[in-house]
């Protein structure tokens, strides 16, 4: 139960502390490590504000898109909800790589190793393509079955729309992976404002789709909304990355 879980975690903490004290004393902070200047505080504060604003804008875009979906009927909403849950699960490899990549980039920024950043980004982009291929194969064989499993529905509209959402989105996983890796990498390189613009592109794109395309093309527009926006965002972010002075210094 919960008591056992808490006890196990407590034991893990004690063992980790003992191991650090015995074998990895370099991780123990000293007095000199606690002396930080105002520059570091400002850097952390401004970066957190940038990331917070980006998340807020992304959430606002999701609310706008949901407003457009709500007028398409309960069965369409049910299929879309199931598909989004599956999408949130299948894009975890991309999000995990982007998070790991941001740490890798920031460490090599501190170590002044731009060549390692370039090589790491290329490998992350290739990884995104591999995830895309796996997603396409998975959705081609199991999209409708997975929607039925998640939704618990046998309604043809629910299964068809949910499966179509997954099938049409899967080929764009490579674009999404490049988008996430590049945006997180730019933030790790100290870029605060330029990555924020990508979220503005997303918000504006979703507003346009809700006002113009969804009323005309119905759920097809909902399916293509995010993949098309991802393409614009990725093009912008990659252009910013290719002009990043640390990664690509002018000779």
How does the language model describe each region?
Residues 51, 55, 63, 67, ...:
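Transmembrane alpha-helix boundary and packing residues in multipass membrane permease domains
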Residues 2-4, 77, 192-196, 222-223:
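Alpha-helical transmembrane segments and their helix-entry boundary regions
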Residues 79-143, 176-190, 194-198:
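Small-residue-rich hydrophobic transmembrane alpha-helices
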Residues 56-89, 107, 145-155, 212, ...:
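Helix-terminus/linker motif at the lipid-water interface of multi-pass membrane proteins
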Residues 2-3, 7-49, 105-172, 213-251:
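Short alpha-helical transmembrane segments in multi-pass integral membrane proteins
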Residues 20-21, 59, 71, 140-141, ...:
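Conserved catalytic core of Hanks-type protein kinase domains
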Residues 85-86, 200-209:
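Small-residue-enriched core segments of transmembrane alpha-helices in multipass membrane transport
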Residues 10, 15-18, 33-64, 69, ...:
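Hydrophobic faces of transmembrane alpha-helices in multi-pass small-molecule transporters and flippases
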